A protein has these predicted regions:
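Conserved beta-strand signature within the Rossmann-like core of class I S-adenosyl-L-methionine
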Residues: 75-88
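A short SAM/SAH-binding and catalytic strip from SAM-dependent methyltransferases
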Residues: 48-63
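Core SAM-dependent methyltransferase catalytic element
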Residues: 111-154
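Conserved Class I S-adenosyl-L-methionine
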Residues: 86, 90-121
Length: 154
């Protein structure tokens, strides 16, 4: 419904906001492009101050999606992932296959990216829905050291 895209555009005229959608109707909306968020767009790589998404639950390859979004960020850029309890296991479906509770999301992200990212979050109600919305803010760390090997505990 483009609520978030319009809201972010209303915050400032100093940055551009575009929306992406995989559907063919994406270009029917102002400032929207048709794009699969799993795919890297070389023009966007390393050029974005922030990436916002509320679509991670719709991903068949959520790790790839987050990796792609992180690759689009400038140095000191942030990735904002909106997630609700409706995106958890009980809300998972063919259209929304990634069913992870928001309370588990930091652990999942840490398993995927380890010390490559820093994570913070906040919980609030959005003005267009009457349920808690979790905002996870991810930032790529400049120098990261992995303390855990994937095949064994150290």
């Amino acid at each position: 419904n483009r609520f978030e895209q319009n809201f972010l555009r209303s915050l400032s005229r100093t940055f551009d906001v575009i929306g992406t959608d995989i559907s063919e109707t994406a270009t029917d909306y102002e400032n929207s492009v048709q794009w699969d968020f799993h795919n890297v767009n070389p023009a966007w790589s390393g050029n974005q101050d922030f990436v916002y998404t509320n679509s991670l639950d719709q991903s068949w390859q959520p790790h790839v999606a987050v990796e792609t979004w992180l690759s689009q960020l400038k140095e000191n850029g942030i990735l904002i992932i909106e997630h609700t309890h409706a995106h958890g296991p009980s809300g998972a479906s063919e259209m929304d296959p990634f069913g992870v509770k928001p309370t588990v999301m930091p652990y999942v992200l840490t398993m995927w990216f380890g010390s490559q990212i820093s994570i913070s979050h906040s919980v609030a109600k959005k003005s267009n829905m009457d349920k808690d919305s979790w905002l996870f803010v991810l930032k790529k760390n400049q120098h990261s050291v992995s303390l855990i090997k994937s095949d064994a505990l150290v």
